[in-house]
């Protein structure tokens, strides 16, 4: 694989056209076996694995030599009954073939990604999810509308094959990929990424995620150059915009300009403010302009999907939201822009006066109601927030019970430390303290009062002294209650917060039809 990448850097077109021979290399299936074994071992112990799932490289060599003699393709791996052919489990060898087909397209795509990163010297990778929020904090207040985009799900495997044609000219590899995609249609047909991973866990998660990421990358890689061209283009096309026409007419009636001088003067009117962020299957485009401009962008993006990917997305896939009147959910936060009024004293040489300065401020809030719903789903409380004891944890030691509740609380606080209002986090801590006390009371068959007298302030103090100091300072009354803290070590969303995010998406999806 490394040698192929080194050769590909010297002659990338030749490397793209001859990927199919990789499918006949035993080392490729050894790599696929490693991925399969690592994934399987995390779900079940070795003693529970079937004897038919034991991998044999000798069997792979026999199958490869048999295909070479028949001068066929990789289709017998997928469509034939492997149990009758070699006496092994068909699904197991199908997993290995899918893993091999995943590794082959990754070679040219990884080389292309390395070249693109080498050309972008200013590129810096931020792995933390919170790295998106400071960008939104800086740019969103200057925008008027957002386009909440959900990437349309694929409806046919041939769409992916056509996108691969742009980068891979090896026809046998494309035919093999087409056969696998038609055989395993549920690897790519799903309404969202969470459903895709849930379905693919029974088949091949690595191939599913690779196909989804490649498809999302294609959607972005074709849109971003259009935005860059729009940003660096001259302002002359703005004259054809409908919302600008009355403005031009007013200028023509007030001052008489020659047509060529009018166009030169309108160069200062150009104000393209387009900001784009993406997480999983959701994308946010922030625009500064009128509602008509936002509708035009939605129309162009929809037409773009139809022309390049032959997709007809539903209307709720692109939702226009006005920031001044509404909030939107993203990354487990409720985000909005609010007006902030400040009293300013203006001093002049002869006099001074006081006036109000109105500014826009980014306002992220932790969705307390949805978080309580997620806690209710996990049986920590009821739907109204009334605490419930965890009877399933009564068999654990006291330290384990305290540590589990403390870890849940620290994860919630750590992720939502950027919330502008900490009252909801206080409530979450109160809700979690009572189930912890009730669980300990049920274990020791005593009252909650006795548990509190026994443990005292040790509830939720299992974290390290440094973490306790950070939490104490964050909740200190001397600090601003609206101070936001973004962490650079959050690389994935907490499962409880992820459940909250999915629940909120289900609640707001019917509103997208308007």
Curated annotation (Swiss-Prot):
Descriptive protein name: Maturase K
Pfam families (UniProt xref): Intron_maturas2, MatK_N
Originating organism: Dioon spinulosum (Gum palm)
Function description: Usually encoded in the trnK tRNA gene intron. Probably assists in splicing its own and other chloroplast group II introns.
Localization (cell): Plastid, Chloroplast
InterPro entries tied to this protein: Domain_X (IPR024937), Maturase_MatK (IPR002866), Maturase_MatK_N (IPR024942)
Cellular-component GO terms for this entry: chloroplast
GO molecular function: RNA binding
GO biological process assignments: mRNA processing; RNA splicing; tRNA processing
UniProt similarity note: Belongs to the intron maturase 2 family. MatK subfamily.
Alphabetical UniProt keywords: Chloroplast, mRNA processing, Plastid, RNA-binding, tRNA processing
């Amino acid at each position: 694989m490394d040698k192929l990448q080194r050769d590909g850097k010297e002659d990338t077109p030749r490397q793209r056209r001859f990927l199919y021979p990789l499918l006949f290399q035993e080392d490729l299936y050894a790599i696929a076996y490693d991925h399969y074994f690592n994934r399987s071992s995390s779900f079940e112990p070795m003693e529970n694995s079937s004897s038919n799932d034991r991998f044999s490289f000798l069997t792979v060599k026999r199958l490869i030599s048999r295909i070479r003699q028949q001068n066929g393709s990789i289709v017998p791996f997928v469509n034939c009954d492997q149990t009758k052919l070699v006496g092994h489990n068909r699904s197991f060898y199908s997993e290995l073939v899918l893993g091999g087909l995943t590794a082959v397209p990754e070679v040219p795509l990884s080389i292309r990604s390395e070249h693109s990163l080498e050309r972008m010297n200013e590129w810096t990778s931020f792995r933390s999810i919170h790295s998106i929020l400071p960008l939104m904090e800086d740019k969103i207040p200057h925008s008027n509308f957002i386009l909440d985009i959900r990437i349309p799900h694929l409806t046919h495997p041939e769409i992916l094959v056509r996108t691969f044609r742009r980068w891979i000219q090896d026809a046998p590899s494309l035919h093999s990929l087409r056969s696998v995609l038609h055989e395993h249609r549920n690897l790519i047909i799903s309404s969202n990424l969470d459903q895709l991973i849930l379905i693919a866990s029974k088949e091949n998660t690595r191939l599913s995620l690779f196909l989804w990421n490649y498809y999302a990358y294609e959607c972005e890689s074709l849109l971003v150059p259009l935005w860059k061209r729009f940003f660096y283009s001259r302002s002359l096309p703005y004259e054809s915009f409908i919302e600008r026409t009355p403005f031009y007419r007013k200028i023509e009636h007030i001052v008489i300009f020659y047509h060529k001088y009018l166009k030169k003067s309108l160069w200062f009117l150009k104000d393209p403010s387009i900001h784009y962020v993406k997480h999983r299957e959701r994308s946010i485009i922030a625009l500064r302009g009128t509602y008509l401009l936002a509708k035009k962008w939605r129309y162009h993006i929809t037409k773009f999907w139809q022309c390049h990917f032959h997709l007809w997305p539903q209307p709720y896939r692109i939702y226009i939201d006005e920031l001044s009147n509404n909030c939107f959910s993203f990354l487990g936060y409720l985000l909005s822009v609010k007006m902030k009024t400040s009293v300013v004293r203006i001093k002049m040489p002869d006099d001074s006066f006081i006036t109000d300065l109105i500014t826009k401020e980014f306002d992220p809030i932790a969705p307390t109601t949805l978080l309580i719903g997620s806690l209710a789903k996990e049986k920590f409380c009821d739907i109204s927030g009334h605490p419930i004891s965890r009877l399933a944890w009564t068999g654990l030691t006291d330290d384990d019970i305290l540590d589990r509740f403390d870890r849940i609380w620290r994860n919630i606080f750590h992720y939502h430390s950027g919330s502008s209002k900490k009252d909801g986090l206080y409530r979450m801590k109160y809700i979690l303290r009572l189930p912890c006390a009730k669980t300990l009371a049920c274990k020791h068959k005593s009252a909650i009062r006795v548990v509190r007298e026994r443990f005292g302030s040790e509830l939720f103090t299992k974290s390290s002294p440094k973490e306790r100091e950070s939490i104490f300072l964050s909740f200190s009354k001397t600090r601003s209650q609206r101070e936001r803290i973004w962490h650079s070590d959050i690389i994935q969303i907490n499962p409880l917060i992820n459940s909250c995010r999915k629940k909120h998406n289900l609640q707001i999806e019917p509103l997208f039809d308007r």
